[in-house]
């Protein structure tokens, strides 16, 4: 089998709801059989299941990750923790959620309490809370880091059914923060919260000529910053957000807590670039003329305007469409040099650009296995959407391969819940606490019950 087919598998476009095989969300990988799936109703049932069963154990979460992270052998166990959801406890500064709570429910619950997390959200919120922590899910902004960095307490059921409580400050807490599901089954997470705030997001288009300096400036001067790099046109679309003024905040409340759009005239300066991007995407994805949700991810950049709202309304606006998503975090200090190298490589090779490059920067993470561990980080994100026949643009995949090669050579660390080529990385060299994490794993799961082929290849 070709390497591309292993890294970027084709998609099954048929309905799989009634099949014996259980697929991941993108339907590009069978993770096991439905008869292997267990759905404990509470922690006690989970403990008993672990005591009574044999074989390896993996948690499915929302099944958004590549299949290799989830898949098990016929004798193994798959867990669905969707029954473990909702608020378990709260005090003035924190809220404890069950591990299977979807992020959208977490965000909605906090908003109703007039609270929020210090970490800004990613673009979608269908992930489970525990799954988002385990894979290092993050948003944008140098004053914050991953979702896992807001955890104060993590409750975990171990392979023998016993319970281990991790508290912030414990020597091994940084291992539990981003664990890849390799230590135990998380059942509850306490998140620190802060008072609810509103933001105004200023959107604009700019040349990418000085992106090397501009990206750092945007992130240093604004609480939250996100950018899309349309390399073909040498253009940027930028969202910079800061705390909303009293006037904008009042307008939001007067508008029934809905997003406020500012300005009578929308900015159309990106429209030609958007049309060109849509042409590329249409050629790459419309084999039979079906589907089309992927187009909405860029049509929203047409006729843009500044907006005000809560942090989730502004940034958690993604459209979940099956895709190959590669995201590599590099040291922020090296980012200007890396941008220059991408520009030079593009000028020399003129690769096919399926989608703009997404740029999000975060502060350093305390989690040993976070791609942002110990260093402010710029995440370069790349997307190739599946065609309606389940195929992928070969030119788009070639670009993914080459740009990952470039970023890996610069000390890049891949997002665990997305696609990457493991052969490109020397894990010990890029993760200072790699062996410390392995030692915690040996202590908590000496028989490696929470492993599969993917986890074994990583750590053994």
Q: What feature does the model see in each segment?
A:
Residues 1-460:
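Noncatalytic alpha-helical scaffold of FAD-dependent oxidoreductases
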């Amino acid at each position: 089998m070709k390497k591309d087919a292993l890294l970027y598998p084709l998609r099954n476009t048929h309905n799989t709801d009634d099949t014996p095989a259980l697929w991941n969300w993108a339907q590009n990988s069978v993770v096991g059989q439905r008869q292997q799936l267990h759905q404990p109703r509470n922690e006690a049932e989970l403990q008993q299941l672990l005591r009574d069963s044999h074989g390896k154990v993996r948690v499915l979460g929302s099944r958004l990750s590549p299949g290799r992270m989830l898949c098990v052998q016929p004798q193994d166990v798959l867990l669905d923790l969707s029954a473990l959801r909702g608020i378990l406890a709260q005090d003035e500064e924190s809220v404890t959620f069950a591990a299977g709570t979807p992020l959208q429910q977490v965000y909605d619950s906090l908003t109703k309490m007039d609270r929020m997390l210090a970490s800004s959200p990613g673009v979608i919120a269908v992930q489970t809370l525990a799954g988002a922590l385990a894979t290092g899910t993050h948003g944008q902004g140098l004053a914050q880091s991953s979702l896992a960095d807001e955890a104060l307490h993590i409750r975990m059921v171990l392979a023998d059914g016993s319970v281990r409580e991790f508290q912030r400050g414990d020597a091994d807490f940084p291992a539990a923060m981003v664990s890849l599901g390799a230590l135990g089954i998380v059942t509850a997470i306490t998140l620190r919260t802060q008072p609810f705030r509103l933001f105004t997001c200023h959107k604009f288009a700019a040349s990418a000529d000085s992106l090397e300096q501009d990206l750092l400036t945007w992130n240093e001067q604004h609480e939250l910053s996100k950018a899309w790099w349309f390399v073909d046109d040498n253009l940027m679309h930028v969202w910079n957000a800061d705390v909303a003024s009293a006037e904008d905040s009042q307008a939001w409340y007067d508008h029934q807590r809905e997003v406020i759009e500012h300005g009578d005239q929308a900015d159309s300066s990106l429209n030609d670039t958007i049309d060109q991007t849509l042409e590329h995407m249409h050629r790459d994805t419309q084999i039979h003329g079906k589907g089309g949700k992927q187009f909405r991810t860029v049509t929203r950049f047409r006729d843009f305007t500044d907006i005000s709202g809560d942090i989730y309304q502004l940034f958690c606006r993604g459209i979940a469409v099956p895709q190959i998503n590669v995201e590599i975090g590099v040291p922020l200090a090296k980012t200007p040099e890396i941008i220059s190298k991408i520009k030079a490589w593009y000028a020399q090779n003129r690769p096919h650009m399926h989608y703009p490059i997404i740029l999000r920067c975060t502060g350093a993470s305390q989690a040993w296995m976070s791609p942002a561990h110990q260093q402010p980080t710029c995440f370069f994100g790349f997307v190739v959407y599946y065609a309606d026949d389940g195929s992928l643009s070969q030119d788009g995949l070639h670009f993914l391969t080459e740009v990952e090669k470039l970023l890996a050579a610069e000390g890049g660390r891949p997002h665990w819940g997305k696609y990457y080529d493991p052969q490109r990385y020397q894990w010990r060299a890029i993760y200072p606490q790699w062996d410390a994490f392995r030692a915690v794993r040996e202590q908590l799961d000496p028989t490696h019950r929470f492993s599969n082929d993917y986890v074994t290849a990583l750590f053994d």
